[in-house]
UniProtKB/Swiss-Prot annotation:
GO terms for cellular component: chloroplast thylakoid membrane. NDH is composed of at least 16 different subunits, 5 of which are encoded in the nucleus. It catalyses: a plastoquinone + NADH + (n+1) H(+)(in) = a plastoquinol + NAD(+) + n H(+)(out); a plastoquinone + NADPH + (n+1) H(+)(in) = a plastoquinol + NADP(+) + n H(+)(out). Its EC number is 7.1.1.-. This is NAD(P)H-quinone oxidoreductase subunit 5, chloroplastic. NDH shuttles electrons from NAD(P)H:plastoquinone, via FMN and iron-sulfur (Fe-S) centers, to quinones in the photosynthetic chain and possibly in a chloroplast respiratory chain. The immediate electron acceptor for the enzyme in this species is believed to be plastoquinone. Couples the redox reaction to proton translocation, and thus conserves the redox energy in a proton gradient. GO terms for biological process: ATP synthesis coupled electron transport; electron transport coupled proton transport. It comes from Saccharum officinarum (Sugarcane). One of its GO terms (molecular function) is quinone binding.
Length: 738
């Protein structure tokens, strides 16, 4: 087994040969390399597959052997200082290796078809392969300085991939925003690393954990200083994992190609922050004040992300806010000491979210022939709808990913999210209430995404629409072919207008007898008559979706109890994941309340599933198709009749919708306070530099010039003038000197 561990350092290096080969090919034989560009996908996938096989072997060894292996090389600079670097293989490392390689391979396969017509195909594969290499290096690092090195490489790759289409101003701005926001966290991370090096004289994890186990409980060091340094480390995780208040870069990161959005949100960049916190949890758990702060940040993030996802029109931005919310759940779990639940949700969420993002890419790919190659149109859910009959395979996989994220059993995220909810209730009712309420919101906004995309009719064709036969699609009504007369059409149409609002908008009521006089519903693009419809993507893009579907269906089984064990006179239900994580959990005392019996699990499961079903129910009422059972019962019409006039409740709804759609005005606040504030400070500094500093210097020079101009007339070449001034200066000298 140790022989296998000795070669674990090869895993991060495996994707490098193809990166170097593509680079040399573009430099030496660019024409041939570009002509044969599709060939380069195969070695990229092959080498990452070898890394995956190696990672699986290491994971099996970890599960069977339950050991931690670390190998170090020492570089002695002088007698007082030496730099150690190496690799660490433990359960956390093996989990992340499998996660990165499996999702990375599927994204590479998907990208081969998705990016096939893009001029930057080779550049994309170079970036994404280097992204995988950087993340693999990050998770195998044995000390903080190595983590920081690969941390920066991950940030650089994300910058390049988010701004992949850099000719688009929005994409260029998005990558700059991600870069600057992450610099805040990276600066904190660097300060924290330097602080702990000053305290311990080492950057190795074993030395930091020694502090946690021995020095801090015995007041061996200044706990306030340690808490400050640990907080700075946490700040790096906050920025990387898009936690409040450094979450603003994540939705804008959707300007990159969809495959990289899947990789960032599933297994690489946003997972790096959670990984760092999980790696250092034996240190953090000895600082109760910081742990409470971590759980608070996670709670705020999970709720904020869910509320901001309620009214988004862009399918990828909606999923981005969903990622932000789910990362908040993981951060909450780590903050309350539920190490296993956090990693379990990291695994299940990664595969479910990769499935959703690649599914959204398939939807975007199918919409582009209709609306053009513009993200503002192809990603706009207002223009979708009814895609279930055009892309049935994508629809099925997307639905499974949606239900998984909603927490519907037996899909993957149900098992992990339910464990987090249970532990949060045991830790604090406040956290439990917010986490449970957000679980219902998650079901609402995720099913909203599904309904707007796949349910109803294809709305892009409702252009210059009229109910008369002169209309382009006169036979298809926005409210269905046969709607009960009792249904208020305005209520249904309100979900189509005003950006597919989260709440119904107050639109003047149309009497039933004016059905044939309904005005047009138009979109500003496309031909008046078109018979182009979306179509299913190719097998190369569907294959990763089907594999991820299998993961979504069955990966939750690693957290299902299969045996009972006894520890400290308590019955513990063992799972594959708990057996896998045993060496890591032994480094610290995990929350003792995390073990619950079958009855408690069933009670909690019924509660969480009920919340999810209620969220699905509400979403179906608001965004279901015109054939909705509730519409036929005049349910919506009864809601409208209760408030026929504009009321205070309508104003509240509009305010909430506006707040959600405008991202809580957080970006606006940052723009006003930080961007404009710094710009005005720069202008003031520029004015002071030019007006005051340069003014003084230029004034001295100008004064010298003027004095020189006056004095030069004294030297006219006459000896009498020279003698006169000479005698004057001598007289003054003799007069003042005694």
């Amino acid at each position: 087994m140790e022989h296998t561990y000795q070669y674990a350092w090869v895993i991060p290096l495996l994707p490098l040969p193809v990166i170097m080969s593509m680079g040399f090919g573009l430099f030496l034989i660019p024409t041939a390399t570009k002509n044969l560009r599709r060939i380069w996908a195969f070695p990229s996938i092959l080498l990452l597959s070898i890394a995956m096989v190696f990672s699986l072997h290491l994971s099996i060894q970890q599960i069977n052997g339950s050991s931690i292996y670390q190998y170090l090389w020492s570089w002695t600079i002088n007698n007082d200082f030496s730099l150690e670097f190496g690799y660490l293989v433990d359960p956390l490392t093996s989990i992340m290796l499998i996660l990165i390689t499996t999702v990375g391979i599927l994204v590479l396969i998907y990208s081969d078809d998705y990016m096939s017509h893009d001029e930057g195909y080779l550049r994309f594969f170079v970036y994404i392969s280097f992204f995988n290499t950087s993340m693999l290096g990050l998770v195998t690092s044995s000390n903080l300085i190595q983590i920081y090195f690969f941390w920066e490489l991950v940030g650089m790759c994300s910058y390049l991939l988010i701004g992949f289409w850099f000719t688009r101003p929005i994409a260029a701005s998005a990558c700059q925003k991600a870069f600057v926001t992450n610099r805040v966290g990276d600066f904190g991370l660097l300060l924290g690393i330097l602080g702990f090096f000053w305290i311990t004289g080492s950057l190795e994890f074993r030395d930091l954990f020694k502090i946690a186990n021995n020095w801090i409980p015995n007041n061996g060091i200044n706990s306030l200083l340690t808490t400050l340094c640990a907080f700075l480390l946490f700040l790096g995780a906050v920025a990387k994992s898009a936690q409040f208040p450094l979450h603003v870069w994540l939705p804008d990161a959707m300007e990159g190609p969809t495959p990289i959005s899947a990789l960032i949100h599933a297994a690489t960049m946003v997972a790096a922050g959670i990984f760092l916190l999980a790696r250092l949890l034996p240190l953090f758990i000895s600082l109760p004040l910081l742990m409470s702060f971590i759980s608070l940040v996670g709670t705020i993030t999970l709720f904020l992300g869910a509320t901001l996802a309620l009214a988004q029109r862009d399918i990828k931005r909606s999923l981005a806010y969903s990622t932000m919310s789910q990362l908040g759940y993981m951060m909450l779990a780590l903050g309350i000491g539920s190490y296993q639940a956090a990693l379990f949700h990291l695994i299940t969420h990664a595969y479910s979210k990769a499935l959703l993002f690649l599914g959204s890419g398939s939807v975007i790919h199918s919409m582009e022939p209709l609306v053009g190659y513009s993200p503002d149109k192809s990603q706009n859910m207002v223009l979708m709808g009814g895609l279930r009959k055009y892309v049935p395979i994508t629809r099925t996989t997307f639905l499974c990913g949606t239900l998984s994220l909603c927490g519907i059993p037996p899909l993957a995220c149900f098992w992990s999210k339910d464990e987090i909810l249970s532990n949060s209730w045991l830790y604090s009712p406040f956290f439990g209430i917010i986490a449970s309420f957000t679980a219902g919101l998650t079901a609402f906004y995720m099913f909203r995404i599904y309904l707007l995309t796949f349910d109803g009719y294809l709305r892009v064709h409702f252009q210059n629409y009229s109910s008369t036969k002169e209309g382009s699609l006169y036979s298809i009504s926005l409210w269905g072919k046969s709607i009960s007369k009792g249904v208020n059409r305005d209520f249904v149409l309100s979900t189509m207008k005003s950006g597919v609002s989260f709440f119904s908008q107050n639109i003047p009521k149309i009497p039933a007898n004016t059905r044939n006089k309904i005005g047009s519903f138009s979109t500003p693009f496309g031909a008046k008559k078109t018979f182009v419809y979306p179509h299913e993507t190719g097998n190369t893009m569907l294959f990763p979706l089907l594999i991820l579907l299998l993961f979504t269906l069955f990966i939750g089984s690693i957290g299902i109890p299969f045996d009972n064990g006894v520890k400290d006179n308590r019955i513990l239900e063992l799972t594959i994941l708990s057996k896998w994580l045993t060496p890591s959990i032994n480094l610290f005392q995990e929350n003792s309340n995390s073990s619950i019996n079958s009855y408690e699990f069933l009670t909690n499961a019924i509660s969480s599933v009920s919340l999810a079903i209620f969220g699905l129910f509400i979403a179906y009422i608001f965004y279901g198709s015109a054939y909705s059972f509730f519409q036929n019962l005049n349910f919506q019409n009864s809601l409208v009749k209760k408030n026929p006039k504009k009321s205070f409740l309508d104003e509240v709804k509009k305010k909430i919708y506006s707040w959600s759609y405008n991202r809580g005005y957080i970006d606006f606040f940052y723009t006003r306070v930080f961007i404009l504030g710094i710009r005005r400070l720069a202008e003031l500094t520029h004015f002071f530099d030019k007006g005051v500093i340069d003014g003084i210097i230029n004034g001295v020079g100008l004064a010298g010039f003027c004095i020189g101009e006056e004095i030069k007339y004294v030297g006219g070449g006459r000896i009498s003038s020279y003698l006169f001034f000479f005698l004057c200066y001598v007289s003054l000298f003799l007069f003042f000197i005694p």
